[in-house]
């Protein structure tokens, strides 16, 4: 009888009954209208049972069954990858299905370990999503569901909540606007790191963001993806004590910026302002079951703050807004602080082990950030951070990522492990790593990443290929299994994008530009990809990977050339310096020419998205300045006359190379040549050069050239083949 009831329920929820569900509409979007040959069935089950999906053939049709819309969407993606040879990734978020539709064959059933699959970092909203419109958001939400995401940080339009809150506290519209950051800097404003920078936003911005967020939220809820709203953590404007007479502490500075003030949890105003915040939030967007709060993020001064009282105040305010809500907090650097959260009730706090792919906090004894106490009995999520600032480069730790997850599951903290999370500072890079992380909870047993990679390549390229496999075997041995110790944060940086200097070891303050593998490795990988192009050049994923592999080979060659020119200058060898520096510059412009053929590596797309926010010239100018500034100087000059964050968000993009990075190097090489000729040194104010670039309004060109032919020509030009 139970089986019969389940069958009837499945039949009612099946597309075979004629109704198009949210998942069916998703399938239609991602398959460009060819998805009506897939039947979906949602079979609800008890919450105590694991999420699942199953694939099977029935009466000549492919059936995807699961316990929720997200589980079914995950199953659809599994079928697309491993049966249909269709890979949905950022370099191609829609693909038509093949005809005839390949059968499932041997039925597939997968169950998830853990009930949560989390997505996004505050920084992602600035480094990747700052200028997205609804069509781009719609495609991303489809990507989320296909990859099993059921819990997502959701901060779009939350500045309007604050705007309305400040008006209720007696601020004028102008004063409220001065507190809120500009479109590219909202992430750090939300995390209590800065106020006002990049703004003020125009009045119309706030209503527009509400409208956009309501569409986002509606789609998330339609697919059963839980939003994580920013909760109230105690942030207030620095001038609030003078404005309304409340007790605050000064958390100090963050990377040269004055942080917002922190409202004392001992002041009765904490509860009152928190309640007003949640009231305004609910007016616009309703309640959430999860709220994200990170007091004292990245070194905020806690002097004079009773951390235990602060944790209680934050939790109590959230529970007044929704008694069933869970506080989500980032496990990052020295947060969460023990005194803030250790005493809080279990299951009311969820800790994101944000950098578990390199420096896990969960208890791995090999980690430099291991906390032997784990998370004090609180629930937690195993996360992959991977990317910093949107800085490009092939990068990952496949073996560490896989083994770390299963080690965590089998550890003493495994009982509190709720699932996995993607927490990159930027997306639209290294698709293999994101795919790998998303599959971890659906694979019951520990597995060899090399075997997984073979399956991934078959799905991504639509066929097996010996040269492509050889290329990726090299990449697996190099950039996709980076060491965990002493290599900086994120991908190995390209010195083409660095502020000029000699003997450089990094391009950004916390980065690393020294390859951890021989530069011949990426060159040989590129050679294999070029050999495979004759067979695979119709696969969009292959074309992106080919361009990226040749890009990596050129970036690695640039490091070797930089070492040569540095040594030549040290020797005073004018001829050798001239030759090496000329090759370095020529390589940079060749890189620009290559990347102009691929949308994922072009500045033009980033600037176009910023300009598209409005037809109003002043608003367009503000958005473009935000877009350009974030990638270059990041912030204003500090007391040193510079900024520690310059080039933190460097991008090896066509348009940036040709209009800023290479002219910057050419200016520097001209100065060094002058010094070698015996002239007095002249200092170059690189900040001034970069700041002038942020005020430009020209559009970098796009190339209509064939990316495969260009990759081959550039490779031959640089490596003399």
What are these regions (language model features)?
Residues 2-7:
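Sec-dependent signal peptide recognition
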Residues 114-133, 144:
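Active-site-adjacent substrate/metal-binding segments within catalytic domains
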Residues 9-17:
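Hydrophobic h-region of N-terminal signal peptides that target proteins for export
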Residues 653-721:
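Extended, compositionally biased alpha-helical segments that mediate assembly or anchoring
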Residues 17-114:
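Contiguous, structured surface segment used for ligand recognition
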Residues 35, 87, 91-101, 120-124, ...:
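Catalytic-core regions of glycoside hydrolase
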């Amino acid at each position: 009888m139970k089986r019969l009831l389940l069958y009837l329920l499945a039949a009612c929820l099946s597309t075979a009954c004629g109704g198009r569900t949210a998942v069916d509409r998703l399938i239609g979007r991602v398959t460009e209208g060819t998805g009506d040959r897939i039947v979906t069935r949602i079979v609800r089950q008890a919450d105590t049972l694991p999420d699942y999906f199953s694939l099977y053939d029935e009466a000549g049709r492919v059936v995807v069954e699961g316990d929720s819309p997200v589980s079914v969407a995950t199953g659809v993606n599994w079928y697309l990858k491993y049966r249909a040879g269709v890979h949905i990734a950022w370099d191609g978020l829609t693909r038509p299905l093949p005809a005839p539709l390949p059968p499932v064959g041997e039925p597939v059933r997968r169950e998830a370990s853990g009930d949560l699959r989390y997505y996004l970092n505050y920084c992602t909203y600035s480094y990747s999503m700052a200028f997205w419109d609804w069509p781009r958001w719609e495609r991303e939400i489809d990507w989320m569901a296909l990859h099993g995401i059921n819990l997502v940080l959701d901060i779009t339009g939350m500045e309007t909540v604050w705007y309305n809150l400040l008006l209720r506290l007696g601020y004028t519209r102008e004063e409220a606007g001065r507190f809120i950051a500009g479109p590219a800097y909202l992430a750090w404003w939300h995390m209590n790191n800065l106020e006002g920078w990049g703004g003020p936003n125009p009045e119309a911005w706030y209503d527009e963001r509400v409208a956009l967020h309501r569409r986002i939220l509606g789609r998330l809820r339609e697919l059963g993806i839980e939003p994580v709203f920013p909760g109230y953590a105690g942030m207030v404007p620095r001038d609030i004590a003078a404005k309304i007479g409340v007790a605050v502490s000064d958390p100090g500075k963050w990377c040269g910026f004055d942080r917002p003030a922190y409202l004392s949890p001992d002041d009765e105003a904490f509860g009152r302002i928190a309640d007003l915040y949640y009231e305004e939030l609910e007016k616009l967007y309703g309640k959430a079951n999860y709220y994200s709060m990170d007091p004292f993020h990245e070194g905020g001064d806690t002097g004079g703050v009773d951390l235990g009282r602060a944790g209680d105040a934050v939790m109590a305010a959230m529970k007044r807004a929704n008694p069933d809500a869970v506080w989500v907090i980032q496990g990052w650097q020295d947060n969460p602080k023990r005194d803030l959260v250790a005493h809080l009730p279990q299951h009311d706090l969820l800790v994101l082990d944000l950098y578990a792919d390199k420096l896990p906090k969960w208890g791995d004894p090999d980690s430099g950030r291991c906390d032997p106490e784990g998370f004090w009995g609180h629930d937690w999520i195993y996360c992959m951070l991977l990317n910093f600032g949107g800085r490009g480069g092939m990068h990952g730790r496949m073996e560490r990522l896989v083994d770390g997850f299963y080690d965590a599951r089998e550890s003493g903290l495994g009982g509190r492990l709720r699932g996995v999370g993607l927490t990159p500072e930027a997306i639209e890079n290294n698709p293999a790593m994101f795919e790998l992380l998303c599959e971890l909870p659906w694979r019951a047993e520990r597995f060899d990443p090399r075997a997984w990679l073979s399956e991934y390549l078959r799905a991504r390229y639509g066929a097996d290929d010996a040269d492509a496999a050889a290329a990726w075997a090299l990449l697996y041995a190099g950039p996709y299994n980076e060491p965990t110790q002493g290599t900086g944060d994120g991908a190995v940086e390209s010195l083409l994008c660095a502020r000029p200097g000699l003997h450089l070891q990094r391009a950004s303050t916390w980065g690393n530009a020294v390859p951890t593998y021989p530069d011949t490795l990426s060159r040989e990988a590129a050679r294999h990809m070029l050999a495979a192009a004759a067979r695979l050049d119709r696969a969009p994923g292959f074309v992106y990977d080919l361009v990226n592999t040749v890009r990596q080979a050129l970036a690695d060659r640039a490091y070797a050339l930089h070492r040569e020119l540095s040594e030549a200058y040290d020797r005073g060898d004018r001829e050798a310096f001239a030759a090496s520096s000329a090759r370095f510059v020529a390589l940079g412009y060749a890189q620009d020419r290559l990347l102009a053929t691929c949308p994922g590596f072009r500045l033009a797309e980033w600037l176009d998205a910023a300009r598209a926010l409005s037809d109003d010239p002043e608003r367009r100018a503000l958005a473009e300045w935000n877009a350009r500034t974030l990638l270059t100087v990041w912030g204003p000059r500090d007391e040193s006359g510079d900024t520690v964050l310059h080039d933190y968000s460097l991008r090896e993009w066509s348009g940036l190379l040709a209009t800023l990075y290479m002219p910057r190097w050419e200016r520097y090489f001209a100065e060094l040549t002058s010094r070698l000729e015996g002239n007095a040194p002249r200092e170059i104010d690189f900040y001034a050069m970069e700041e002038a670039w942020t005020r430009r309004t020209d559009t970098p060109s796009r190339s209509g050239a064939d990316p495969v032919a260009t990759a081959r020509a550039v490779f031959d030009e640089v490596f003399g083949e």
